[in-house]
Amino acid sequence: MKEEYWEQFMTTGRIADYLSYKAESGSSESRCLEEQKEQAGVRSGESDCFDRDGAFHGKISSFARGARRPNSPLVGAVNPFSFGEFTMYEGRSSHTIQSVKITNYFSELREDMIGAYYGFYFLEFANYYTKEQNDEREMLKLLYQTMKALTSPHIPNLLIRRIFELKAFCINGEGPQVFQCVRCQKKDGQMVFSAREGGLVCTDCARNISDGISLDNSTLYTMQYIEISTIEKLYTFTVSREVLEKLSGIMERYCLLYVEKRFKSLEILETLV
C-alpha cells in the first residue's frame, strides 16, 4: 500500500534536485530544491528529495508528473525558488507529488538574473555536500535563510556567498579552525590563515607555511562570528570592502582546496559579475 504524507518544500531551478523535510505524524517542515531546468539533463518532473522523519531517509527520488502541462496544479512544484506545502505518496522506488500549495515564491530572485544564479550556486553547493541517509536539517535551514537574504537589498550578494560557503563547511564538519593555532593551540598573538593547514597558524608555527594569509582582527572576528552564530542571525551584518576582499580571498583558497566539483552555476555567475 502506498504511503501518503504531507511535505513542505522549497524548489530551485534545476528540475533534478529536491530537498524536503518531513516531521513526525505526517506534518512536515521541508525544503525541496530543484536546479535549473536547462542544465539538469533529466526528465521533466523528476527530482531527488531529502526527507526528515524519525528514520532520516536523506536523499530520495521524487516526481511531479505532468507539471509542465498547461494549467497543471503542480506547476509550482517545478518553478524555481518556490516554498510551500506538498502532498506526496511513497512508491516502491520513488515518491510522487500529488498536490502543492506555494506560500513563498521568492519572486525577487526570478526577476534578478545575478541573484538567481547566486541562488542556483548555493543550491548546487548544498546538493554536492548533502548525502543519502543523513539528517540535513541544518543545511536546509541555511539554504532557506540564504534565499531570504538574497532578496534583501541591505547585504551584498558577495558577502552572502562567503557567509554561506563558510557556514556550509562548518555544517559539513569541514570548517576551518579560527579560534586557535591548528598546530600548538595558541589562542592569542598574530596569526595567519592557511587553507592547507585548515585554519589559523601562529607566527611561531608558520615558518614553513607557504600559503599563509595575514589576518586583521576585523576579518578574523567576522569568520568567528559566522562559525559560532545561529543560522537565523547569520545575515544580520555587513563588513567593510577591505574585510570582504580579505574574506573572499580566504574562501576562494579554501573552496579550491576542499571542493572537488566545479559548479556550472558558478561558472555562469562569474561571467555576470
Language-model regions: role of each:
Residues 1-25:
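Compact, basic/aliphatic-enriched, mixed alpha/beta core segments that act as assembly/interaction modules
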Residues 12-15, 28, 258, 272:
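Short, leucine/isoleucine-rich alpha-helical interaction segments at C-terminal helix-coil junctions
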Residues 43-45, 53-273:
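Non-catalytic alpha-helical scaffolds and adjoining flexible linkers that form interface surfaces
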Residues 22-51:
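Short amphipathic alpha-helical interaction elements located at domain edges
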Residues 17, 28-31, 231:
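A short hydrophobic/aromatic micro-motif that marks alpha-helical segments and, especially, helix-coil
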Residues 14, 25-26, 185, 210:
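Generic secondary-structure boundary signal with a strong preference for alpha-helix termini
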Residues 9, 29, 168-169:
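Enrichment for repetitive, rod-forming helical segments
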